[in-house]
Amino acid sequence: MKKLNTIILILLGMICTQLYAVQLNSIYPLKPNDSEAFYFTPENYPIKADGKMDVSDALQAAINQVKKEKNFGILFIPEGKYKISKTIYIPTAIRLIGYGKNRPEFILAKNSPGFQEEVADDKGKAKYMFWFTGAVVKEGEKPRDAGASTFYSAMSNINLRIEDGNPHAVALRTHFAQHSFISYVAVYIGKGKAGLFDVGNELENVAFYGGDYGIYTTKASPGWPVMMVDSYFEGQRVAALRCQESGLAMVNLYAKNVPAVFDIDPNYCDKLFLENSYFENVSGPAVVITNENNSNNQITFRNVYCKNVPTLAKYTRSNTATHVAHKIYKVKSYDHGLQMDNMVDMPEYETLVDIEPIQKMPVAQLMDIPAPVSYTHLRAHETLRH
């Protein structure tokens, strides 16, 4: 009987993993041996990965050490729970990468100082767990936000958690550019504000639970579009994503139990492209378009599967909406913006919708690349140098 229960649990886990588009396991189960990297371990820094000791200062010192000694590089974070209570600044070209059987988790402690009130002079009106910056932030200095010249910064295979008593906490601020990314990160926002403010370059296999928003964002750094692949949003109180001029391109997004999936800021436009994605239990409109019939709007959905989503879109200026009577349906295509039938036609503002009812939600796409079983440093192979 015990064996049967174990098999059932494994099967249920496989179903949940496949259904929700993201993987929550550690993708680096083994320690990468890299002579050029730094390791955030008790042997190297005065820390304990027990979730009780505050490692904020030690973590910031380790990140700054990588920047000072190498200018660019990796700080590897072993499996464990790491308590922090202040903003950690990650300068240009520094990457935090977790490893171990389970992903390491950084936890913002309950009632951490400064996370209770809105930060009026901050762009995101919030305080951040991790803020990607353009340079090392010295004590007493105002941070210089990451921008169009912030390359190679990243966080991967690490989970983040916001504990109670931090209503204006946001886990990540990521306004970086080329070769920068957030990947294999699950953010447990709880009663905090959001998982991420200001998107940058690429997000892959990211999950957001709770919060007012999973992501809220303005436009990306100048010249750099943003791609988000394999993402999951659940239980946000206002919207999965709040955006203005974000220019997001998204594939394999799953949003569940939210009032709205996309909420475009009042009087702003956006260019959103969404493909092969899933909406489930959306109580309000899936997308709120606040500035309809504007040439800067390009809202495009392709192959989006919906369950319990009675309103696909709301247009606030005209107080109209695109309603769908089917309980489960496929949005073969949805286009809002300027439309042309051919290259010589005059463009017109239109909303084009092609929907068909379906019997059940399909299984979400799942990455089938296996976890690594070994790690090889290229510099160890002398023949590759010639």
Residue ranges of model-derived segments:
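Short amphipathic alpha-helical "recognition" segments used for binding
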Residues: T6-I7, H386
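Extracellular "leader-to-stem" segments immediately downstream of a signal peptide or signal-anchor
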Residues: L4-T6, C16-F76, I84, Y89-D164, ...
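Hydrophobic helical h-region of N-terminal Sec-dependent signal peptides
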Residues: L9-G13
